[in-house]
């Protein structure tokens, strides 16, 4: 997706992380690699395998209203991989399949909850004579995320949780672009809804590539990484007590904010190893607590990287979860 040369307000990736990942702390591996502190916000355009079905619509035909995909057994949340001989990765691929359509059923390959299925879909002509499917699809994602750490070669880890759909299923990412970004505002949380950072891409030129989407974060590589612009950081294990997060909530420069690590749990197979509470009055004044878009913010304790912010409590924006850094390293 091309980033247009204008201020573009971006939706922040949802802080939904339901996937499982095993844990085992290994300081020996961490000590052999030089890590650099993140805390900066990057913009992502992510290409996913297939096209996700996000809704249906009726097609007005000479014989009344029709909804071919819905009638063929396709469900919201399904991912379309193929239509006949056409591989589907974008809305344009769907259009191409319809342009080549002659008659009869199209055998459509979909993924539903991780299971591959074949369904038969019969396109219909609308009043203009064009074939339609009566479906809304999403073929790529755009958003902001906070980097947790970099390595010397420019590779980075961010978010601390997967990029998932509304059903909590991890997107199958096949690539994407990375852009510099700036934060231009915040929406503070309410008692029933999490707040979020608001930002925009800076420039049209990509500064890196997305490489993978995992249960413990979104990974990529910066093309021209300048290590002198980032602080070296050692790796350690979190324990209850005072700590800080390193996060960007205004502009492009990250700052340290005080938090308390309330609880640690290294036996849970999730992204919720740490319970944290914001204790920094300045941050609470600016944001009202942890916001969507802050996920991935490094958690620093005694000068060492111990984890990353992953979730916010909906009923208490000052509290949230963090992931142990070792999970992201592995």
Where are these regions (language model features)?
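Serine endopeptidase catalytic core focused on the charge-relay Asp
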Residues: 124-288, 292, 301-302, 310, ...
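PDZ/PDZ-like groove recognition
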Residues: 40-76
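Sec-dependent signal peptide cleavage junction
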Residues: 20-40
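PDZ-domain C-terminal substructure recognizer with occasional recognition of PDZ-binding tails
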Residues: 32, 40-42, 75, 95-135
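Bacterial N-terminal signal peptides that target proteins for export
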Residues: 2-12
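Conserved PDZ fold ligand-binding element
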Residues: 69-91, 299-302, 306-310
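PDZ domains, with a preference for the canonical peptide-binding region formed by the helix
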Residues: 82-113, 316-318, 323-327
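Bacterial N-terminal signal peptides
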Residues: 11-22
